[in-house]
């Protein structure tokens, strides 16, 4: 099967702030595109929030999401990404807004620093936090697109938009696999921070468990390029590894093709 491989995004290196940042490679003067997705920032209340706002702006993640949306998932009603406040990350269907607290970025950064991400994985904690933010923005934008387009989801919507965020990174963002792996690692870090047991209510939660989300994301990354990521699933027991690798290759193709029934490449419109 042929996948859309158009590269919309290029990665940069900016001083010592981030190892990898994202930026738009196609600026559009079209007012319709410009108004498709709107980014707003609440006034930072502390010096820490001011720093976070600046780091988010410098990272270019918003431009990446805007480019992907303009190219693949246009909204009937403009979507607003609102940074700041206490709620989120979440998509609010009542206001058609994605809410991202400044504290979410700070929490992600803390996880990557605490787990010595640069020492263990060769990527800075800032890169891990930015990658996680990008995956989260695409995840929440996925909820918004499902609501906006009235897409029927058979199964957990949270799993569906996790998959969407990951295949968008893999198919359209340069070094998107690295970003997806960072986001998966964040799921693993959160899982390690949990008690050894789940509350009964969590078994009927809309989200899969963090460790499931970790392996599901890695599965798609492996399936996108088995040769490049041949060791990515080595945590899986040998008794299951061969079958899981075969499944992940097929799973990536199926998820990509299924989502492209709803994604609209503007070059083909």
Language-model regions, residue ranges each:
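Active-site metal-coordination segments of metallo-dependent hydrolases
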Residues: 45-55, 148-164
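Classical Sec-dependent N-terminal signal peptides that target proteins to the secretory pathway
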Residues: 1-25
């Amino acid at each position: 099967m042929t996948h859309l491989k158009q590269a919309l995004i290029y990665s940069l290196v900016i001083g010592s702030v981030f190892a990898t940042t994202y930026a738009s490679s196609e600026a559009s003067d079209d007012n319709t595109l410009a108004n498709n997705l709107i980014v707003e920032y609440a006034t930072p209340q502390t010096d820490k929030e001011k720093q976070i706002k600046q780091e988010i702006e410098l990272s270019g993640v918003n431009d990446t999401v805007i480019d992907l949306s303009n190219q693949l998932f246009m909204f009937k009603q403009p979507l607003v990404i609102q940074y700041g406040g206490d709620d989120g990350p979440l998509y609010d269907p009542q206001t058609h807004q994605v809410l991202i607290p400044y504290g979410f970025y700070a929490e992600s950064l803390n996880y990557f620093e605490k787990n010595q991400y640069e020492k263990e994985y060769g990527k800075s904690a800032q890169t891990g936090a930015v990658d996680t933010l990008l995956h989260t923005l695409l995840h929440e934008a996925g909820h918004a697109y499902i609501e906006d387009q009235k897409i029927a989801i058979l199964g957990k919507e949270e799993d569906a938009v996790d998959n969407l965020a990951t295949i968008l990174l893999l198919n359209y963002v340069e070094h998107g696999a690295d970003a997806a792996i960072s986001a998966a690692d964040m799921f693993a870090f959160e899982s390690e921070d949990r008690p050894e047991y789940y509350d009964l209510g969590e078994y009927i939660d809309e989200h899969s468990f963090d460790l499931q989300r970790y392996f599901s994301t890695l599965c798609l990354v492996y399936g996108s390029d088995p040769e490049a990521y041949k060791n990515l699933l080595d945590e899986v027991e040998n008794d299951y590894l061969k079958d899981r690798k075969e499944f992940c290759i097929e799973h990536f193709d199926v998820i990509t093709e299924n989502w492209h029934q709803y994604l609209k490449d503007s070059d083909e419109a």
